[in-house]
Amino acid sequence: MEEYKTILKIDKDPHEKGKYLFETDEFGFNPGQVTVLVGPNGSGKTTMLTNIKKYLRSNDIKFVSYDNVWETKLSLDRSICLEDYISAQTLMCSSEGQGVFHNISKFAERTGNALHNKAKNEKEFWIIMDASDSGLSIDKIVAIKNDLFKTIFEDVPEKDIYIVVAANSYEYTVPIKGLPIECRDVKTGKKVVFDNYEDYRHWICNYKNF
C-alpha cells in the first residue's frame, strides 16, 4: 500500500445523485512530485480538483490554481483592461494551443510571485492545474514539465510543493529526468503505471469504472 504525506477526505457523492462518483473517501498526495489524475472525460477529474481546493481553503493552505476556460477569459479581459491590445489581438487570433501556452506562461509568473511573496514563509504550497494540455503539442507539454514543474522544485527545495494535474494527454504521464510523476486513477485513487501510449490508450478506452 502506498504511503502519502497528506491524506484528503473526499466527498464520494459531490452531486448528491445517490450514486458515488468516487470509489474512495480518501486520496493521498506526496510533495516533490507531479500527481497526474487520469481517467476519460466525465470521470471526475475536475470535481476531484474542486475537492482538493475546498480542503486547502478550509485549512488555510496556500495554493494557485489554473483552469483553462477561466484563464483564457481572464487573460483576454486583463489585456483589454490594461489597454494591451497587442496581447489581446494575439489571444484572439492565435490557435487554441498558442493561447493556452500564453496563459500558462502568465500563470507561471503568478506562481513564482506567490511562492516568493504570499507563501514566502509557508512550508507547504500546492499547484492545481486543470486542462492545461488542451490544444498543446507534445513539445509544449514537455516544456511545461521542464520549465515550470521541474524549475519550481529546484527553486524552492525547502518547501513541500504539491503539483496536481488533471489532463487527457499521455505526455503528462511520462516522467522526465529529475521530475517524478505519479499517475492516479481519479475514481479509485490507485496508482497506475503506463508502459507506453498504447498501454495508456487501452486503459482509457476500457475504463472499467466509467
Locate each region found by the language model:
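Residue-level preference for the first positions of well-ordered beta-strands
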Residues: V34-V36, E124-W126, Y162-V164
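N-terminal pre-Walker A segment at the start of P-loop NTPase domains
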Residues: M1-E26
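Short, solvent-exposed loop/turn segments at secondary-structure junctions
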Residues: G42-S43, E71, D133-G135, Y170-Y172
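C-terminal lobe/lid and adjacent interdomain/linker elements of RecA-like ASCE P-loop ATPase modules
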Residues: D67-S87, A143-F210
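Conserved P-loop NTPase "ATPase switch" module shared by AAA+ and STAND
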Residues: K120-D139
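Phosphate-binding P-loop
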Residues: D25-G32, A119-E122, D155-P157
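ABC ATPase nucleotide-binding domain signature region
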Residues: G32-K106, K187-K190
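Conserved alpha-helical scaffold flanking the Walker A/P-loop in AAA+ ATPase domains
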Residues: F101-K120
